[in-house]
Amino acid sequence: MAPAVLTALPNRMSLRSLKWSLLLLSLLSFLVIWYLSLPHYNVIERVNWMYFYEYEPIYRQDFRFTLREHSNCSHQNPFLVILVTSRPSDVKARQAIRVTWGEKKSWWGYEVLTFFLLGQQAEREDKTLALSLEDEHVLYGDIIRQDFLDTYNNLTLKTIMAFRWVMEFCPNAKYIMKTDTDVFINTGNLVKYLLNLNHSEKFFTGYPLIDNYSYRGFFHKNHISYQEYPFKVFPPYCSGLGYIMSGDLVPRVYEMMSHVKPIKFEDVYVGICLNLLKVDIHIPEDTNLFFLYRIHLDVCQLRRVIAAHGFSSKEIITFWQVMLRNTTCHY
């Protein structure tokens, strides 16, 4: 009996291996057929920004403001307005910013205002969250919201909302900055940097991305389809971690947005609009002002940066408290 059992085991294993091989082959065949059935597009090497431009303003967005700031910014002349994209559920992140880099409203006599940009809660409205958000707005008055769904692919709608809000309700801002809730901002450094500029018009800066390739990997969140963006490279643009522009550009960019179809990447979209307006990126001489990728920063480095990306709410609070201590830096 023993030899028969030993003979049967390899046969079973061979049969199992054969089944797995056939299964993998079938899956591979399916993927090949699926890929071949997809429409294929030639990547356009030479970029023509007029490809995105429509002569009629057919892309003007008419979403309704459902929450707006308490302060009457139209009667103020803020030096800087910081607009932070946030999800409705990011309660802790907003609070962390309110008690750290967004707390102080005046730096050396220059007014700095911070607001949060939200859409409507995605999927079914969470009534508890909706009530909490209303209470938060009553308490702080710093939430700006429209009635589009708050999703990753709608980030561009938030940016368009931000430009519209500045146009209609805060037109006297000298500078605006768009950033995210996971970004550490050294507000004092930012104000100093802007005060030391030689010019304050037609100004745009941040973490520059030049000749950045469009990514076609379908299962990655940074994927963009050929239909949406047919070119090989993106325009020169600044990362959405934190870009800054002078107030005079806001109405020009907002008007251009009504002629340019939104794409899923809001920072690239702003870059397209600015390229159509022939506005160049001001590249900072100091390469240590903006950090796109999370890196280890000590307290002395934090005192030198303007914006660093990839921090949790807890880390933002901790690093802000550490930065305020009287630590002597020798570099």
From Swiss-Prot:
It catalyses: a globoside Gb3Cer (d18:1(4E)) + UDP-N-acetyl-alpha-D-galactosamine = a globoside Gb4Cer (d18:1(4E)) + UDP + H(+). Pfam families: Galactosyl_T (PF01762). Glycans are attached at N72, N154, N198, N212, N326. Its EC number is 2.4.1.79. One of its GO terms (biological process) is lipid metabolic process. GO terms for cellular component: Golgi membrane. It is a single-pass type II membrane protein. Keywords: Glycoprotein, Glycosyltransferase, Golgi apparatus, Lipid metabolism, Magnesium, Membrane, Signal-anchor, Transferase, Transmembrane, Transmembrane helix. Detected in brain, ovary, kidney, uterus and stomach. In ovary, specifically expressed in follicular granulosa cells and shows particularly strong expression at later stages of follicle development. Residues 1-20 are cytoplasmic. Its main location: Golgi. Its cofactor is Mg(2+). It comes from the Eukaryota. Transfers N-acetylgalactosamine onto globotriaosylceramide. Plays a critical role in preimplantation stage embryonic development. Belongs to the glycosyltransferase 31 family. This is UDP-GalNAc:beta-1,3-N-acetylgalactosaminyltransferase 1.
